[in-house]
């Protein structure tokens, strides 16, 4: 009996051990199987053969993508020809890309714009993330966009604002006219913003008396770069069509690049030869950005040890191109949208003017030192950036490695677009998202502590993360200074056949979110006459 009992116990023990081993193996292989199961790709609409979803984008891509997120969710996948493209359409999804996985999405995909216009990516906008890119960005950050540099360059911005006011005041008092003259406001603002930046960058005003053919050429180049840059080049996404250049985009880019390169070579040669007068109104004589860069090249003060990482004339020209493309029309466009919204909302305009009258008075013009006291006006600027971001879609980034976002698999090499415009109109974040309500940013409002500096992913007009706009601080100060000056110095009337409630607010999208119709207005001086008597 004892032997039989022992045999039974041994048999039970062996059976238990065997079952335990089987269960363990089953669990291990089950988990391994689950681990091997790939995550799904983000959802998205079915595309066309060869072209993918390109034909579905339409003329206003940001609006089309916003509508797609309503159907497929806040993270969608598209095919642009042979390229995988993912679109972030909500603040939480954008935060995963631009904060949690920022390092993985710090480079740009190669495209025809970077290759043919931006010196083959040897710039800050299109350049790949790495030592050269960091060195170039540091140059801009220290010499143009740091707090000290901004304060040093304050006189440029204020002087150009003064000249803009003088021009508008003279137009309003044109002899022989019974009513103020009409002006295309965007053009006036663009002269102001472009000249302020050009004085800081190359030591002279682009638009100035006697500037002549060179100024016209410069402006034409910047405008055409913005236009061509906003075109989706099919050849970037369908390699078989690249050599055909079916849209003629690459041919235009090459021609445009030659024009810009010739112009910059002449400017650099003149500066080196000493025939271009050094600016007498810069921080130190000759210490505009171009002068600093040329000195760096001449003195062999390389920021990196390797021969390939030197800053050369090519990098200088690429940087100057970046500055003018990213820092001129973007700024004037936001100011124009701000003024259009204020004209449409007379009560908000009145409130802004009352604040300015208290802070500044009516016997002088605004200065930058006044800006920190303009609580309501800062809320106005934030609300304009929310509804009318100058770049409604972020410039594309690229996944260096495969990763997981919001439970979906993002393939290596996938291109990322963030729908800045759509996120800022998300009713889950913004009550009454289509209404222009600066009060939402005031103390006691729904978004009191939100800023536009990349910290709040519901409002990222300058982007976020490592690739956030290098010129954020300059752009924000220039927009606020220019718009506040216009509101303080003038009342604004529309042409006789228009009323504020019927003002056309349609968008025209290239690389920028511009107005479909330019804002034409009549400026009426509202300060004491002595305020406009500027030496």
From Swiss-Prot:
Family: Belongs to the cytochrome P450 family.
Protein's pathway: Secondary metabolite biosynthesis; flavonoid biosynthesis
Membrane topology per record: Single-pass membrane protein
PANTHER family recorded: CYTOCHROME P450 98A9 (PTHR47944), FLAVONOID 3'-MONOOXYGENASE (PTHR47944:SF18)
GO molecular function terms noted in the UniProt entry: flavonoid 3'-monooxygenase activity; heme binding; iron ion binding
Signal peptide segment: none
Compartment list: Membrane
Protein name: Flavonoid 3'-monooxygenase CYP75B4
Organism encoding this protein: Oryza sativa subsp. japonica (Rice)
